[in-house]
C-alpha cells in the first residue's frame, strides 16, 4: 500500500523582491531591491538587528573577490567555502553561492534548474518532476521545482526553489532552497515563513 504524505505539497511560490546587505561594492540600486553600501553609509548592527529578528535563522556572510553579502541561513550551518554557505534545519536546506559572472540571474537559475532536473531524473525513487516557467526581472529570477520521493511505500512530495539575484554588476547570489518532506516536522512551517521574509519569496501553504 502506497501512502502519500502531503506536508507542504501545495506551497505556492510567488516572486517578490528580497533585501540583502552587500558590502565591498559600489552599487546604487533601488533600496527595495538591494541595500548596498561602500563604507560611507554604514548600517549599524543595532539597526540591522531591529529589522531582522529570527528564531530559526542566523546571520552569515559569503565573499568572493571584492564582493561580500550578508544574509540569513538556518542556525545549524555548514561552511562550504568563503563564497558559499549551506545549512539544513527541520527538513529545509538553504544553499547560497556568490558568483562572479557575466550571466544574467535568469540564465544562472535556468541552467541550475536543468542540472537539478537531470540529477533527479537519474534516480529511480524520484518521480513526477515538474517545474514552473519561472518569474522575475533583470535583477532577480527564480524557478520552483517539485518532485516525489518514494521511501518504504511512502511518497514524500518535495520541492526546490532556485533563485538568482544580481547584487553588483559583476556578482550574482545563487540560492537554492530545498524542502525534503522525509525530514520536515512541526517546526518546518515556521522556518519557511522566516525564509520567505528573509529571501523575498512568498511561500503559501
Locate the predicted segments by residue.
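Conserved polar/disulfide-associated segments of primarily extracytoplasmic proteins
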Residues: 80-171
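Short, well-ordered beta-strand elements
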Residues: 169-181
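N-terminal targeting sequences that direct proteins away from the cytosol to non-cytosolic compartments
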Residues: 25-84, 179-205
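Bacterial N-terminal signal peptides that target proteins for export
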Residues: 2-12
Amino acid at each position: 500500500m502506497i501512502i502519500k504524505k502531503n506536508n507542504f505539497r501545495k506551497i505556492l511560490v510567488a516572486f517578490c523582491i528580497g533585501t540583502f546587505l552587500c558590502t565591498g561594492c559600489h552599487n546604487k540600486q533601488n533600496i527595495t531591491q538591494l541595500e548596498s553600501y561602500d563604507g560611507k553609509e554604514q548600517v549599524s548592527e543595532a539597526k540591522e538587528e531591529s529589522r531582522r529578528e529570527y528564531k530559526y535563522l542566523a546571520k552569515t556572510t559569503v565573499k568572493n573577490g571584492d564582493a561580500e553579502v550578508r544574509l540569513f541561513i538556518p542556525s545549524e550551518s555548514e561552511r562550504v567555502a568563503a563564497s558559499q554557505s549551506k545549512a539544513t534545519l527541520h527538513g529545509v536546506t538553504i544553499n547560497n553561492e556568490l558568483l562572479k559572472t557575466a550571466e544574467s540571474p535568469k540564465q544562472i537559475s535556468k541552467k541550475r534548474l536543468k542540472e537539478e532536473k537531470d540529477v533527479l531524473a537519474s534516480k529511480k525513487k524520484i518521480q513526477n518532476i515538474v517545474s514552473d516557467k519561472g518569474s522575475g526581472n533583470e535583477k532577480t529570477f527564480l524557478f520552483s521545482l517539485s518532485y516525489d520521493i518514494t521511501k518504504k511505500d511512502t511518497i514524500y512530495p518535495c520541492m526546490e526553489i532556485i533563485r538568482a539575484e544580481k547584487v553588483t554588476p559583476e556578482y550574482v547570489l545563487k540560492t537554492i532552497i530545498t524542502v525534503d518532506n522525509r525530514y520536515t516536522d512541526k517546526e518546518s512551517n515556521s522556518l519557511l515563513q522566516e525564509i520567505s521574509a528573509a529571501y523575498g519569496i512568498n511561500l503559501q501553504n
